[in-house]
Amino acid sequence: MFNTHKVEIEWGGRPLTLETGKIARQADGAVLATYGETVVLATVVSAKEPKPGQDFFPLTVNYQEKTYAAGKIPGGYFKREGRPSENETLVSRLIDRPIRPLFVEGYKNDTQVVLTVVQHDLENNPDVLSMVAASAALTISGVPFMGPIGGARVGYINGEYVLNPNIDEMPESKLDLVVAGTADAVLMVESEAQELSEEVMLGAVVFGQKGFQPVIDAIIKLAEVAAKEPRDFQPEDLSDLEAKMLAVVENDLRDAYKITEKQARYVAVDAAKAKAKAHFFPEGVEEPEFSAEKFATVFKHLQAKIVRWNILDTGSRIDGRDLKTVRAIVSEVGLLPRTHGSALFTRGETQAIVVATLGTGEDEQMIDALTGTYKESFMLHYNFPPYSVGETGRMGSPGRREVGHGKLAWRAIHPMLPAADQFPYTIRSVSEITESNGSSSMATVCGTSLALMDAGVPLARPVAGIAMGLIKEGERFAVLSDILGDEDHLGDMDFKVAGTDNGITALQMDIKIDGITEEIMKVALEQAKGGRVHILGEMAKALSTSREELGEFAPRIEVMNIPTDKIRDVIGSGGKVIREIVEKTGAKINIEDDGTVKIASSNGKEIEAAKKWIHSIVAEPEVGEIYEGTVVKTADFGAFVNFFGPRDGLVHISQLASDRVAKTTDVVKEGQKVWVKLMGFDERGKVRLSMKVVDQETGKEVVAEKKAEADAE
């Protein structure tokens, strides 16, 4: 019934298996990939024909994690998987980025790649495995995909590169880098690092590329026995139309791309496009020689050619800068004084307002992952409203791009944050992109660094980011610093680097062409370093280090530790005690399983009151110490005094006063405040207190007072 084919290799110390022919046989391509005991099903379906009038390639990558893969049942009311999580969105983008450039140009059939994690061994991360599975499924599907690609994760532990470190090894690694590419070229890099040098980062990319070569060989081996017949698709030759259009609008486009202001430039480009449209689609002609879709494709190609020729021939860019110059930067902090921290970062025509907010442990984000539930105390959210590029558009929940850009900025900032025991706050940073002309994610990095320092978050060092570009024709190439939006769209590489003056904290690279050599990447990294240092210098004009005090409106948090066996006493039956503390003092209290207690309030007196209350519950009274207490009950033989939190003790009638006492109520009454000295404990552990050895007015020991008076005489 099944015509199965399987390839197995040893990869990074674990078996990798690629199997097809048994599951999802109606898809164009389907591969079940296993690494260790983590299993991913990859399927590919591509429409037989493109939709009429479609002028783009509708590729969708959906990565989904099923909770049954880890032996779990989903939380929530409906008990089933819902909308994609942030991680699922990020992994979908991670796979989309290296495969999209490898589809034959001009292919516009609706294509969907679905990756389903069906088993997770809690050791091997399924993201890279899903990338490999997607590559294998595409390679055998028959769609015009110029792969295969491979992918690998690279760690850096004890000064050594590690191929595909498992989940338990990652906390020890100074690097989390995922690289993907073909046998000859790197196509995509995504990473977070702890201030590593350019040499170490480049070495990791090269190490990863070599590491995934066996995977590419395995996919080719599978395709040799299982691939479907390639689809009969030939990209249309539009060179004649391109030559005709170039003759009509070349001068207009060259003039347009000499205009440095974005909106004015777009007006000039639109005028050139209208001129070409009038030439090729004259009024009265019902059947032009080519379609509107072909016209749009060719005009876009011409735009790219004009920009690329100008840069390679003259070294001058769209806005008049040379290759290395960063646009003018203006930084401002304290923009919104009632927020906890804020910054306005403007670089050319790209601008971000970033606001930092500090919260308590109650504000941490609870993340329910396949590997377990954990809390995240640092959140960074990136918003890209349509007005930032002078357009109208959809508003609402964040799209994939916004999630991805926010996570890149998160990776850049995260290594510089203080440890939780040094700064016990939950941090949320929100970046509102108010203008955009390229590199808004790196503006978010710079703005977030400034806003956090303005809020008093003790960053180890300021962080800045820069986006690099590449124009390559044959052997000629130009690396561009701080690229514009047009240079991103029309160029061959988008290379974002963020870090401090000590090293790189995040790197993201997307390459659209083959032939990006190690030498080109080295040039780009070194040029990015110079740009990053320059940007840090410009940021320092606004604020060079974190403020020593928190903002006026930020909550204060103090941390104390209590014995774990006392946690139940502080919480009380059904939370009765801790609720009373919160209600009476006004402070927020968070108690962790290890006995760490975080007390938060904007009022210092409330924090002190809560600390004192908790201390009275968990601390043990010391023999010989004097305490203030309240009489809670009287009896013939003495008085019971509440003197240490919830602790009561007996003052025997003989210890009430120096003179003989006939009746307890002659000396004290219930509710009366008294001073007592802890004399000790009886054989049953009961507390023995004394009032007569303490001056009830001063709270000082009587014997000590008399001795002091004698010494004075």
Swiss-Prot record:
Pfam families: KH_1, PNPase, RNase_PH, RNase_PH_C, S1
Broad EC category: transferase
Location in the cell: Cytoplasm
Required cofactor names: Mg(2+)
Gene that this polypeptide is encoded by: pnp
Provenance organism: Brucella anthropi (strain ATCC 49188 / DSM 6882 / CCUG 24695 / JCM 21032 / LMG 3331 / NBRC 15819 / NCTC 12168 / Alc 37) (Ochrobactrum anthropi)
One example GO MF annotation: magnesium ion binding
Gene3D superfamilies tied to this protein: GHMP Kinase, N-terminal domain, K Homology domain, type 1, Nucleic acid-binding proteins
Name of this chain's protein: Polyribonucleotide nucleotidyltransferase
EC number: 2.7.7.8
Keyword Cytoplasm included in the entry's annotation: yes
Transmembrane segments: none
Catalysed reactions, semicolon-separated: RNA(n+1) + phosphate = RNA(n) + a ribonucleoside 5'-diphosphate
Domain spans labelled S1 motif: 624-692
Domain of life (superkingdom): Bacteria
